[in-house]
């Protein structure tokens, strides 16, 4: 019952009902543990096109799904959490769950924990190698 699945129930059901699909799910509950602090991130973003893009995105993106943190002092790194989990599976734990009762009954893998410290460290190391 997460907002990503509620935004596109047809796509979610399609994936859940696809036989033999190796389906790995990074939940909002799990990836919320990988958050960047605004002050720290802004200090570390470079004065280049990527740095400007990231700062602008942070400042101007409207978080329509929540009213928590109106100053946007923290940012959950949704996409980075799944990318890091794929690249470094040792930094993530997956458990097997059954699909919901209304869907094709099969096992899917759900990320239940991530090593957010290692993921942050890896991001900044790679970011700092750019340019």
Regions found by a protein language model. Give the residues of each.
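N-terminal acidic, glycine/proline-rich low-complexity segments
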Residues: 1-131
